[in-house]
C-alpha cells in the first residue's frame, strides 16, 4: 500500500494519536506515584551551593548525551542541523529516563526524526549507535570499578564481592573484544532484520567510550554533591552503576524505588544516614528527571508545531 494512499494516511493519523495518548497516560501514572509535597520540601530545604552545582552538572550531562546523537550523525552521514539533533536528543533522553526506552529512546526518536525528514533505516542506525554508546561507557566504568573492588557489598546481598569482581573482569573483556573487532575485523558490514550496520573504526569506538564514560561520571558527581560529599565519589559512582543495571532488569519507568533501594542498602549505616540518602535521591530525581521532562514536553510541542517547516528546509538542503 502506497504511503500516499488514503488508508495509509488514516492509519498514520490513528497511530500518531495513540502514541500521544500513551505518552499522556504514562505521564499521569508517573506523576501519581510521586509524593510532590515531599519533593518540594526537600528542594526548599536543600543546601543552595550543592543544588546550584548539581543543576550545572545536569546541564552538562544532557549536553554530553546530545553528543551521542551527534556521533550517530557522523556515523550515518545524515545532514540534519546539529541544533536539531541536540534538541531531539534532549527530548528523547528526558522521556527515556522517565517513561522507558520504548517511549523515549525508540518511539520518540522515530516520531521526531521521521518528522524532520530522516528515513526509518537511518533512525534505526541512530538509535542503535546511541544505545551502544551509552552502554559502552557503562561497561568500561563498571568493569574498572567492579574489578577494583570499590563497591563494598553488604553481607547476604544478592551477589558477593568475588562475583562482582568476576563480573567486572567480564565487562572489561567485552570492551577489549569490541575494540579488537573495530580495529581488525575484515568483515565490517552486517545486516540485522534488514538493517545494514557498519562496524565503526577503533578511534570512533574510543570516542564512544570516552563521551559515555564522562556522562556516567557526571551523573555520579551529581548524586555525590547532593549527598554532601560525605562519601567517596567513586563509591557513589559504583553504587549508581549497580542501581542502573538493577533498574534495567526490574524495568520500572524511571527506576522508581530501585535507585533508592540499592543506595540505601549499600550506603546507609556507617557511610551516611538513610534520611540523607533519600533526600539526596529525591533532589536528584527533581533535577535530573522531573524538570528536564517538563522542559522536554514543551520542546516537543514546539518541535511538533515547526516540524513541517523544518522538514521542508531539511529536504531542500539535502
Where are these regions (language model features)?
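Predominantly cytoplasmic-facing regulatory/coupling regions of multi-pass membrane proteins
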Residues: 1-90, 147-248, 274, 279-281, ...
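Generic beta-strand or strand-like secondary-structure segments
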Residues: 71, 75, 90-93, 108, ...
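Membrane-interface alpha-helices at helix entry/exit sites of multi-pass transporters
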Residues: 83-87, 101, 106, 116-132, ...
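Membrane-embedded alpha-helical segments of transport systems
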Residues: 91, 95-99, 122-143, 246, ...
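Transmembrane alpha-helix interface/packing and boundary motifs in multi-pass membrane proteins
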Residues: 92-100, 241-260
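Re-entrant/interfacial helical elements at transmembrane boundaries that shape
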Residues: 103-115, 144, 253-268, 282
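Internal, well-ordered alpha-helical segments in soluble enzyme and binding-protein domains
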Residues: 109, 119, 128-135, 139, ...
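Interfacial segments of multi-pass membrane proteins
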Residues: 112-122, 239, 243, 261-276
